[in-house]
């Protein structure tokens, strides 16, 4: 069974629209499970064979069941400006990466206890 999850929220640097990538801890493996995209502009989109495309309530699209493992359980991100507003959101917390590390390369790593 899957364990805890978190989502990376941000505003697309070209369109300014909100984008979401949601990850889960799948028995010690970081896995991209689903993604929200407001439209398919500026590099966003769905690729056949990579998840299931569904319409989101209120507009936009969810790509469900992507289930793509993240290499080495580590996601490398260059944190965007305050306008991009990168943030990690869980059921209980929100961490604003743009406020903490604007324009900095960070690694988001799954802690497996090893």
Predicted feature residues:
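Mature extracytoplasmic/periplasmic domains
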Residues: 40-42
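N-terminal secretory signal peptides
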Residues: 1-38
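Mature, soluble, non-transmembrane domains
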Residues: 30-33, 44-114
């Amino acid at each position: 069974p899957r364990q805890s999850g978190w989502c990376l929220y941000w505003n697309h640097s070209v369109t300014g629209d909100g984008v979401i990538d949601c990850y889960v801890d799948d028995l010690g493996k970081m896995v991209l499970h689903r993604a929200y995209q407001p439209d398919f502009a500026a590099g966003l989109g769905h690729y056949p064979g990579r998840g299931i495309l569904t319409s989101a309530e209120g507009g936009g699209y969810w790509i469900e069941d992507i289930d793509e493992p993240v290499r080495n359980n580590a996601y490398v991100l260059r944190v965007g400006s305050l306008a991009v507003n990168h943030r990690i959101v869980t059921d209980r917390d929100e961490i604003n990466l743009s406020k903490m590390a604007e324009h900095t390369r960070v690694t988001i790593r799954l802690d497996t206890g090893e």
